[in-house]
């Protein structure tokens, strides 16, 4: 392999430093070559995709994803596809694009969207995914009519599926991955309303020994309302960043309202603050979508999910459970959950007792949260 070597002065460098310099150079080049090699296996013809989307017609436009617009397409075989067209103003360069292709191509989980291929041509960058006619959870859960389709069984299946998908990304895949943009519009729904996590343009990889560590970035990317406070304000992120976003999503699914929603009589309270206020005052029924109460009542399963959601949105990342703990909580029939502390971005009256782990709980709250848990400490 022909390589243009850099001209450097090595007189003052130790032989060991020279060795590590060239080791890093060749290793980096190998990684990039391997990414491109993997990506070529999935490369599709641009004209094929252009025709499939009717030349990216506005009628085929499905919405906006991370870094670009998404279109519906139909291949000659009749297969329906979703095409993510990278915006030239998005800020996602070739490295990020190749990263998404090479990464997603290797991910195999029933709760992750499957990548079918990609395309490079000139300045065009396209990602081709499997298509879901139900589109995203956002189209259902925040629509007063379509939300009625989502009974509690479906909502619980969505919550559990997203939890398993994130656990796979954090701990079980070949790579260890932080999604960084977990939200309702990035959860697609198949014909049976099973959830599929989508949009991997903002993911970050980390080593196994970094799973409990915090990393930093000067380029904060994501969606406000779902961002953890430490990430939004300081660029600090970890697996607990995704956990926070998951908690927001869980509470949205249960209430059927966006995170920026506030009740008319309490316009200063957004969703997290409203849920916390109701929880503290023992008015848990007010947290739940009325359509669920009418058809199912306030079940232990619903109470458990509210409790888990509040544990996830705690201000301190160290207080939030891991996705492994969350999956265990969701699967357990008998579990005693730790008492959640005040959520991040709380806009109501601060109750100092909510920050005290030894404080005696309000008996009204305790009576609502008598789902028993044996594993108190998150892994």
From Swiss-Prot:
- Record-linked InterPro entries: Kinase-like_dom_sf, Prot_kinase_dom, Protein_kinase_ATP_BS, Ser-Thr/Tyr_kinase_cat_dom, Ser/Thr_kinase_AS
Residues with the modification Phosphoserine, per the entry, are 185
Q: Which reaction does it catalyse?
A: L-seryl-[protein] + ATP = O-phospho-L-seryl-[protein] + ADP + H(+); L-threonyl-[protein] + ATP = O-phospho-L-threonyl-[protein] + ADP + H(+)
Coiled-coil region: none
Q: What positions constitute the catalytic site?
A: 181 (proton acceptor)
Q: Superkingdom, according to UniProt?
A: Eukaryota
**What's in the keyword line of the UniProt record?**
ATP-binding, Kinase, Nucleotide-binding, Phosphoprotein, Serine/threonine-protein kinase, Transferase
Which residues are reported to carry the modification Phosphothreonine? 223
| Pfam families noted in UniProt | PK_Tyr_Ser-Thr
What residues bear Phosphotyrosine in this entry? 129, 231
Which EC number(s) are documented for this chain? 2.7.11.1
Q: Name one GO molecular function term.
A: protein serine/threonine kinase activity
Q: Where does ATP bind?
A: 62-70, 84
Which residue range or ranges hold the Protein kinase domain?
56-336
Enzyme class, first EC level, given as a word: transferase
The entry's family comment says: Belongs to the protein kinase superfamily. Ser/Thr protein kinase family. CRK subfamily.
Name this polypeptide is given: Cysteine-rich receptor-like protein kinase 44
- Could you tell me which species this protein originates from? Arabidopsis thaliana
Q: Which gene encodes it?
A: CRK44
């Amino acid at each position: 392999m022909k390589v243009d070597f850099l001209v450097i002065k090595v007189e003052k460098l130790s032989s060991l430093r020279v060795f590590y310099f060239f080791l890093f150079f060749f290793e980096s080049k190998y990684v990039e070559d391997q990414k491109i090699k993997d990506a070529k296996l999935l490369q599709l013809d641009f004209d094929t995709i252009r025709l499939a989307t009717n030349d990216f017609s506005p009628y085929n436009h499905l919405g906006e994803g991370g870094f670009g617009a998404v279109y519906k397409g139909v291949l000659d075989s009749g297969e329906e596809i979703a095409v993510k067209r990278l915006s030239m103003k998005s800020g996602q360069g070739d490295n990020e694009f190749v990263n998404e292709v090479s990464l997603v191509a290797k991910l195999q989980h029933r709760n992750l969207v499957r990548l079918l291929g990609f395309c490079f041509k000139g300045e065009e960058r396209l990602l081709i995914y499997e298509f879901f006619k139900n589109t995203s959870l956002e189209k259902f859960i925040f629509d007063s009519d379509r939300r009625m389709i989502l009974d509690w069984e479906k909502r619980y299946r969505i919550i559990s599926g997203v939890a398993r998908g994130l656990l796979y990304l954090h701990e079980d895949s070949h790579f260890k991955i932080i999604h960084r943009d977990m939200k309702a519009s990035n959860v697609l729904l198949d014909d049976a309303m099973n959830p599929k996590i989508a949009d991997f343009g903002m993911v970050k990889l980390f080593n196994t020994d970094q799973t409990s560590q915090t990393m930093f970035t000067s380029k904060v990317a994501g969606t406000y309302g779902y961002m953890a406070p430490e990430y939004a304000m300081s660029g600090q992120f970890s697996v607990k960043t995704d956990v926070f976003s998951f908690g927001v999503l869980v509470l949205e699914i249960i209430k059927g309202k966006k995170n920026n929603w506030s009740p008319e009589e309490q316009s200063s309270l957004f969703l997290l603050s409203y849920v916390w206020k109701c929880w503290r005052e023992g008015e848990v029924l007010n947290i739940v979508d009325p359509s669920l109460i009418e058809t199912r009542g306030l079940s232990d399963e619903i109470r458990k999910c509210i409790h888990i959601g509040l544990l996830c949105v705690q201000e301190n990342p160290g207080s939030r459970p891991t996705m492994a703990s969350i999956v265990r909580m969701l699967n357990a029939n008998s579990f005693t959950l730790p008492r959640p502390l005040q959520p991040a971005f709380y806009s109501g009256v601060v109750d100092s007792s909510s920050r005290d782990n030894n404080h005696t709980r309000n008996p009204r709250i305790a009576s609502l949260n008598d789902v028993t848990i044996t594993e108190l400490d998150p892994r």
